[in-house]
């Protein structure tokens, strides 16, 4: 099924261990390269869906000069969107707790922008998943943030961690998207378009 990917040297440009884990689950050969410093600011005029697309394209642009003829570069960015506000990675522990308090008892949207780049073509797409949290107590938020230190996660949580077990009451869309890479979509896009 994934034989069309064998013609590429797949390069995942990501610092995210979750994206690495998800790509490894496909049982395909790939390399990981750490991201250089990429400016993750974005124009204020962008919608929630456009923000992670823009950032994933900026990440791809930072790597383009290192690509070879057979390279397939995968870059991604994930945000949490609630009431017109972006929740990216928290700045510190206090910010992480504030984010989880804002998400508590509400439904938010996790949006991941993915860019697939070869020397011949670039394809970008966004995937959205709705996630509903139970009302979280301060003790639950404190425990999670202190024990799991979710400073590298959009919205200050990992759905695959303790907070997901006790706090997520509903999920509509791709679970893997909430982890950081909607893995089904890149596979189908490479098969159809690259």
Kindly give the residue locations of the regions a language model identified.
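Residue-level detector of anion-binding/catalytic polar loops
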Residues: 29
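N-terminal beta1-alpha1 ligand-phosphate binding loop
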Residues: 5-26
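A short beta-strand-loop structural module common to alpha/beta enzyme folds
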Residues: 32-38
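Surface-exposed, flexible loop/turn segments at secondary-structure boundaries
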Residues: 18, 38, 122
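Cofactor-binding loop segments of dinucleotide-utilizing enzymes, especially the Rossmann-like FAD-
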Residues: 15, 35, 119
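Anionic-ligand binding patches
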Residues: 3-6, 10-11, 46-192
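Generic structural signal for helix capping and beta-alpha/helix-loop junctions
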Residues: 40-42
């Amino acid at each position: 099924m994934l034989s069309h990917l064998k013609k590429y040297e797949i390069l995942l440009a990501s610092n995210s261990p979750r994206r690495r884990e998800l790509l490894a689950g496909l049982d395909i050969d790939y390399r990981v390269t750490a991201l250089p410093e990429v400016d993750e600011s974005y124009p204020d005029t962008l919608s929630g869906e456009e923000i992670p697309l823009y950032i994933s394209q900026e990440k791809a642009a930072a790597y383009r000069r290192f690509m070879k003829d057979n390279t397939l570069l995968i870059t991604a960015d994930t945000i949490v969107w609630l009431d017109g506000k972006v929740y990216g990675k928290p700045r510190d522990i206090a910010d992480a707790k504030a984010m989880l308090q804002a998400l508590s008892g509400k439904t938010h949207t996790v949006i991941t922008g993915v860019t697939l780049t070869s020397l011949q073509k670039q394809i970008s797409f966004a995937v959205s998943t709705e996630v509903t949290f139970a009302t979280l107590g301060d003790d639950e938020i404190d425990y999670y943030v202190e024990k799991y230190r979710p400073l590298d996660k959009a919205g200050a949580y990992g759905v695959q961690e303790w907070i997901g077990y006790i706090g997520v009451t509903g999920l509509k869309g791709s679970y893997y998207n909430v982890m950081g890479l909607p893995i089904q979509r890149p596979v189908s896009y490479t098969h159809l378009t690259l």
